């Protein structure tokens, strides 16, 4: 499965009323300035996960990226 843009992920989210948004993993990744650095990268396929996208977040240590998933649970 590849990481897709948040826009495409939200389209998938709206298509499935029973879907939810969860963190794909608990890791934090250094932010590289644009989501384009993450889209297209391959992540392990997990049953029930429809899509994975990168989201920018920020805390007192600075910006970071976290991977979010659209799941059917």
Where are these regions (language model features)?
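Acidic, low-complexity, intrinsically disordered interaction modules
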Residues: 16-73
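N-terminal acidic leader/helix
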Residues: 3-20
């Amino acid at each position: 499965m590849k990481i897709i843009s948040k826009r495409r992920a939200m389209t998938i989210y709206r298509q499935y009323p029973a879907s939810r948004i969860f963190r794909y993993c608990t890791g934090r990744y250094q932010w590289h300035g644009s989501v384009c650095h993450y889209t297209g990268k391959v992540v392990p396929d997990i049953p029930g996960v429809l899509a994975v996208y990168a989201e920018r977040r920020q805390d007192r240590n600075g910006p970071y990226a976290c991977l979010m998933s659209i799941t059917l649970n």
